[in-house]
Amino acid sequence: MSNILQSVPVNQKVGIAFSGGLDTSAALHWMRQKGAIPYAYTANLGQPDETDYNAIPEKAKAYGAELARLIDCREQLVAEGIAALQSGAFHISTAGVTYFNTTPLGRAVTGTMLVAAMKEDNVDIWGDGSTFKGNDIERFYRYGLLMNPALRIYKPWLDDTFIQELGGRKEMSEFLIKSGFDYKMSVEKAYSTDSNILGATHEAKDLEELSSGMKIVQPIMGVAFWRDDVEVKREEVTVRFEEGRPVALNGVVYSDLVELMLEANRIGGRHGLGMSDQIENRIIEAKSRGIYEAPGLALLFIAYERLVTGIHNEDTIEQYRESGRRLGRLLYQGRWFDPQAIMLREAAQRWVARAITGEVTIELRRGNDYSILNTVSANLTYAPERLSMEKVEDAPFSPADRIGQLTMRNLDITDTRQKLGIYNDVGLLTGNTSVALPRIGKDSDKK
């Protein structure tokens, strides 16, 4: 039996994730006119482009909400963001520049905390502004049903009647004005923006064309570092971790992770750190393109990864990276709280993050241009004297030890040579100019 309603649930409570923008304002008032009883829930995610959260619930009541609540999600969102950082849950990157899954993290928190608030008010029908082509419709569906198995979904944007009556921004604006609201439609940007305390996503409209680059975006968490008239000064910053948790920036200790993230955003934002242009696969396997900002997470990630590589061995780092990519994809798909994701996340937090204690000094320049100046940790397994080119006392191994080690390599070198000979005999290497290998002959040919 489907949980999705395709027409207005008359005389029933409907919870709507209310942002205060045109779409949700028009939808809320329209549902009220059609006989539904709207309950508005607004998530305070620390959106950098939101100036007055307290005004949003009052606006919802004016549009017809029976009840309007503001839910502070910032602490939980930052906690989930740090968990993603600790486990490297980022699978989308281009040429080493990472997208930090900030929108999927925001949806995980919004989808669970708002539905939990709805349950307190005995609201079992939920609506939001996600469209049928995007990722969010599935993310919210999964998280909502995880929190409330009795939940039903009503999305105005899946209702043909709503689409016919209010099919676009112009129609929605006219509808509100006709209903007596002094609504002035904002100047439409060349792209859409969604943000939270962890990062911002810019996509759609002009950005759907790959010929439109990052330069058409006005950053909301940083500076347009590509512009010559924007002054960006070099800056040294120190980041300290204790047992995998960021605790200090530039020597200032933060007991509140929300305040630490805000300061990290300010520092990274001064340089445009963490901006990226990505082509990605949506959940439905169609490709989309986005311009992303995440100045604070990018700063913390540089320091965290530096400590990871200085503390852990190669196999642990490999496992951390492989599991992190898998976990990042699960997060992107709306499966952050699924058992397979919890297993990957908690393994990384326990066995990788808990060893990460130390301080990293970084010089930030423009955009993602930076240098690591110093790394200090009592847990470092990096020891320069082990491989020093100078003569050292108590060397960990001698030339004779290396001769023995190289001699043991003869076993796999011989095996490799035999396999290459087999490939040559069956014609796999003959004439293959893409494989830069010397000609392999049989040992018997040299006798």
Swiss-Prot record:
It is found in: Cytoplasm. InterPro entries: Arg_succ_synth_type2_subfam (IPR023437), Arginosuc_syn_C (IPR048268), Arginosuc_syn_N (IPR048267), Arginosuc_synth (IPR001518), Arginosuc_synth_CS (IPR018223), Arginosuc_synth_type_1_subfam (IPR023434), AS_cat/multimer_dom_body (IPR024074), AS_multimer_C_tail (IPR024073). L-citrulline binds at Y99, N135, R139, S192, T201, E203, E280. CDD domains: ASS (cd01999). Pathway: Amino-acid biosynthesis; L-arginine biosynthesis; L-arginine from L-ornithine and carbamoyl phosphate: step 2/3. GO terms for cellular component: cytoplasm. PANTHER family: ARGININOSUCCINATE SYNTHASE. Homotetramer. NCBIfam families: argG, PRK05370.1. Belongs to the argininosuccinate synthase family. Type 2 subfamily. This is Argininosuccinate synthase. It comes from Janthinobacterium sp. (strain Marseille) (Minibacterium massiliensis). The lineage of its organism: Bacteria, Pseudomonadati, Pseudomonadota, Betaproteobacteria, Burkholderiales.
